[in-house]
């Protein structure tokens, strides 16, 4: 399963580990993804999403129905 937030689209980015001696080695910065069940009152069921912490804040602010409509509009499976 890919490490991408279903709400924001955030995914891994690359960068460097930098040691005290300033040696650089490549690394990946992973998004803070969580599997979370959201209750959708209009459908009378739970929906399980893989969302980042930022995605959860967006759902709290805008509402699960609006966010689900956008995910479905963009072709996401929910």
From Swiss-Prot:
Q: Where is this region: Disordered?
A: 1-20
Top-level taxonomic group: Bacteria
Q: Which InterPro entries match?
A: Ribosomal_bL28 (IPR026569), Ribosomal_bL28/bL31-like_sf (IPR034704), Ribosomal_bL28_bact-type (IPR001383), Ribosomal_bL28_sf (IPR037147)
Gene Ontology biological-process entries: translation
- Does the record carry Ribonucleoprotein as a key word? yes
Gene3D superfamilies, alphabetized: Ribosomal protein L28/L24
MF annotations from Gene Ontology: structural constituent of ribosome
Keyword Ribosomal protein annotated: yes
Classification via Pfam families: Ribosomal_L28
**Keyword annotations from UniProtKB, A to Z:** Ribonucleoprotein, Ribosomal protein
Annotated coiled-coil segments of the chain: none
SUPFAM superfamilies, per the entry: L28p-like
GO (cellular component) term, any one: cytosolic large ribosomal subunit
Family of this protein: Belongs to the bacterial ribosomal protein bL28 family.
Query: What name does UniProt use for this protein?
Result: Large ribosomal subunit protein bL28
Q: Which organism is it from?
A: Pseudomonas fluorescens (strain ATCC BAA-477 / NRRL B-23932 / Pf-5)
């Amino acid at each position: 399963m890919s490490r991408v937030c279903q709400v924001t689209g955030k995914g891994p980015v690359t960068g460097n580990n930098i040691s005290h001696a300033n040696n650089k080695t490549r690394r990946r910065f992973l998004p803070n993804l969580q599997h979370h069940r959201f209750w959708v009152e209009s459908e009378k069921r739970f929906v399980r999403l893989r969302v980042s912490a930022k995605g959860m804040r967006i759902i709290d602010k805008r509402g699960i129905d609006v966010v689900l409509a956008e995910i479905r509009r963009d072709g996401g499976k929910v």
